Amino acid sequence: VQLNLVKKTKDSLMKKPHIWISDLTHTAQGISANTFPLGASYVYSYAKQQLGKDFNFKLFKFPDHLAEELKVRSPQMLCFSAYSWSFELSCKFASLAKKRDPNLVVVFGGPNFPTDEVEKFEFLQKRPYIDFFVELEGEFGLVDIIQRLTEYNFKVDSLKSYSEKIINTSYIFEDHLISGSIERIKDINVIPSPYLTGALDEFFKLPLTP
């Protein structure tokens, strides 16, 4: 009975669409950012709490690990933290993954994004592989993106054609910048602790600072 239960659990995980969240670090000369992917793990924990029944979420820190997984399958959505020290690395992964699977939804989120509307447009226009960029609280933005895309069977152009405004999120459609309302987290308790939920357990085994 236990073996059958394990098999059913694995089968259900395989069938559920995969959403991967990455906070990458350079590793050519040691681990450049040798800390836990804390910010991304909060987004991961909140998204899993809200949508874990329907999607299989996974958290990545190391480029080699992400590259190996991408060789096996393409997820439904690939998300990246946007920090200045790893931005180009994330962009390279995003562009290659998008080229391999044009239907892949690519989401970026983080502080490495302009505040001026014109600069936002230029930023996204130069990076067409980025489908959506989430500002400020990534937790609310990512969940809203997933929920909206679910209504459109994850067809990005269909969603964008209706100029859907997504919380904390900007995107380009037909040379227009579409930005949703900004919502801040008012109660930190709505975000599950990634330490208590086990989201960061695997990273304790690695040479990283919690």
Locate each region found by the language model.
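Short, Lys/Arg-enriched N-terminal segments with co-localized hydrophobic residues
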Residues: 1-13
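Phosphate/nucleotide-binding beta-alpha loop and adjacent structural elements of enzyme active sites
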Residues: 7, 28, 150
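A structure-centric signal for secondary-structure junctions around beta-strands
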Residues: 16, 37, 163-166
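Glycine- and acidic-residue-enriched helix-capping/strand-helix junction motifs
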Residues: 28-40
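A short, N-terminal amphipathic alpha-helix
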Residues: 43-49
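Radical SAM [4Fe-4S] cluster-binding motif and immediate context
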Residues: 189-190, 194-210
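Nucleotide-activated donor-dependent transferases that construct or modify glycoconjugates
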Residues: 17-30, 77
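Glycine-rich beta-alpha loop elements in corrinoid/cobalamin-binding modules
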Residues: 46, 54-184
